């Protein structure tokens, strides 16, 4: 029996060895059934159904391509789909071509309707046909996509657009109007346009200003002098990191209107007032400044305040007359720096519509106007609010600044500067140099003044330009004397954007705004 079992075992070994040929890797011995079940279970577990990917695990490029296809397909109008039904296969293969054709059709359609230049559809078509624009622009309307305007306002805007087109034609087609913007400022009759400078292929901001009948550039200059050349010589000589430049200037004078056209760089960051109110630069003035303002951090107040003082100091060294229009709306923020704008207002003889100094009865020196305006601006940067009186008392300022904890340990330094401006110990208003040497601004590092582009060489101006500066100074002194002669009349604070919109008369001693 033992020999029989041993012989059977030997037979099974011989049969197993005959099933393989040496070390052939393609033929393997049979695997036990239990081991086979374990292997199959592991394979099913490894290659089974996986969970769906979350949004963060999706391929970004695939999502972008899908979104583009969806946008292109939704932008196509119903008429174009019916007319081009036989080209649907080609459109699916090349959606970029069909989208560009639709955008060109929109652009041509918007240009054929000049009265609707400021509408939402026109602005949207501009954005889609200009993919290289690095900023986001959209007209914020009242909900239905159409800005409601009275017939008189529409007629004024159409008149301003026609005047701008006339000036552009006189400039040999250098500029092209992209959009007629809303009233982003408070000056009555002023219009803003987004234009393209064809010479450098760059977008610019063009403003159309109504000139007063007694404009300095035409009243105090000889008839044989060209006002445009003189003003461009003066404005072109003001090269400074904290001065917002005027790139081009022109005049339109005829029997129906009297305008000045100015071209400045386009800046999507807006003004200092836009930063305080956290508003978009292109929102209407009557809407964006009705929100709750916020004070700026102390470090930002120090840096921006020092930059504004450096701009005023530069104008003083160049013999430029006082600014007279210094407020947060005329401080443009560009690359983190404050740049003073609105220099052309004083040269053209434009009066400041709402100027806190003109409501004061104690400012008798013309040089102190910008200093007092800077005090109002400093308070607005720290608190976000505007002063309710032209020259507040220090006791009121101390009580007000206690409600703003973000000022911190610099409250004493801020009160020191405000005290020098509104209640000077010696009765003499401080100069710009005195404010620069205060502890709040003295240690601020100005990297823009270290660059090689900044030059301290004072350019020589022509005799005609110097005569214009003297005429502007005399006109400003005369206007200040006229405002002081009317000091016996009660001061009526100007209206806020909300009051202008609703027609409600402001209450006495209400907070007024400087624009």
From Swiss-Prot:
This protein's record includes keyword DNA-binding: no
Region of interest called Disordered, as start-end residue ranges on this chain: 1-31, 73-94, 483-503
GO cellular component: cytoplasm; synapse
Protein name: Slowpoke-binding protein
Phosphoserine modifications at: 54, 79
Sequence segments annotated as region (Interaction with Slo): 191-203
Gene3D superfamilies in UniProt: Phosphorylase Kinase, domain 1, Transferase(Phosphotransferase) domain 1
Tissue: Expressed in head. In larval brain, it is expressed in the mushroom body. Also expressed in larval muscles.
Molecular functions (GO terms): protein kinase activity
Biased composition (Polar residues): 7-20, 73-82
Domain of life per record: Eukaryota
Alphabetical list of PANTHER family matching this protein: PX SERINE/THREONINE KINASE PXK (PTHR22999), SLOWPOKE-BINDING PROTEIN (PTHR22999:SF31)
Gene name of this polypeptide: Slob
Gene Ontology biological process terms from the UniProt entry: modulation of chemical synaptic transmission; neuromuscular synaptic transmission; regulation of membrane potential; response to starvation
């Amino acid at each position: 029996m033992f020999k029989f079992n041993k012989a059977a075992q030997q037979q099974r070994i011989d049969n197993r060895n005959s099933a393989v040929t040496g070390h052939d890797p393609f033929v393997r011995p049979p695997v036990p059934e239990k081991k086979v079940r374990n292997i199959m279970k592991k394979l099913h577990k490894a290659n089974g159904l996986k969970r769906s990917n979350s949004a963060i695990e999706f391929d970004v490029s695939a999502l972008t391509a899908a979104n583009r296809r969806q946008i292109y397909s939704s932008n196509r109008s119903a008429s174009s789909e019916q007319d081009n039904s036989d080209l649907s296969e080609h459109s699916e293969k090349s959606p970029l071509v069909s989208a560009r054709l639709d955008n060109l059709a929109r652009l041509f359609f918007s240009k054929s309707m000049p009265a609707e230049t400021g509408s939402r559809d026109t602005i949207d078509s501009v954005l889609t046909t200009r993919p290289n624009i690095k900023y986001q622009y959209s007209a914020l309307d009242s909900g239905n996509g159409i800005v409601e305007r009275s017939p008189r306002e529409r007629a004024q805007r159409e008149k301003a657009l026609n005047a701008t087109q006339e000036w552009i034609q006189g400039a040999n087609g250098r500029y092209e109007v992209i959009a007629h913007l809303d009233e982003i400022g408070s000056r009555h009759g002023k219009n803003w346009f987004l234009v393209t400078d064809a010479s450098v292929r760059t977008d610019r901001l063009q403003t159309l200003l109504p000139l007063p009948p007694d404009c300095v550039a035409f009243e105090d200059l000889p008839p044989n002098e060209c006002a445009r050349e003189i003003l461009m010589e003066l404005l072109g000589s003001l090269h400074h990191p904290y001065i917002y430049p005027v790139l081009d200037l022109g005049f339109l004078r005829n029997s129906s209107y009297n305008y000045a056209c100015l071209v400045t760089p386009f800046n999507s960051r807006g003004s200092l007032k836009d930063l305080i109110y956290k508003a978009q630069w292109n929102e209407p003035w009557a809407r964006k400044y009705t929100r709750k303002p916020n004070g700026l951090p102390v470090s930002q107040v120090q840096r921006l305040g020092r930059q504004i003082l450096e701009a005023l100091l530069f104008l003083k060294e160049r013999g430029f007359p006082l600014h007279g229009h210094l407020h947060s709306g005329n401080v443009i923020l560009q690359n983190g720096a404050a740049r003073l704008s609105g220099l052309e207002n004083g040269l053209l003889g434009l009066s400041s519509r709402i100027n806190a100094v003109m409501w004061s009865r104690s400012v008798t020196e013309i040089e102190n106007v910008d200093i007092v305006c800077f005090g109002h601006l400093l308070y607005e940067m720290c608190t976000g609010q505007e002063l309710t009186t032209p020259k507040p008392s220090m006791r009121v300022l101390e009580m007000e600044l206690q409600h703003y904890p973000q000022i911190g340990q610099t409250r004493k330094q801020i009160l020191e500067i405000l005290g020098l401006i509104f209640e000077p110990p010696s009765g003499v208003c401080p100069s710009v140099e005195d404010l620069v040497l205060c502890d709040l601004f003295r240690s601020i590092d100005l990297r823009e003044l270290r660059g090689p582009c900044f030059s301290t060489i004072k350019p020589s101006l022509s005799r005609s330009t110097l005569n214009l500066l003297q005429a502007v100074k005399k006109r400003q002194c005369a206007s200040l004397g006229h405002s002081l002669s009317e000091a016996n009349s009660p001061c009526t604070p100007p209206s806020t954007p909300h009051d202008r919109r609703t027609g409600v008369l402001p209450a006495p001693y209400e907070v007024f705004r400087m624009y």
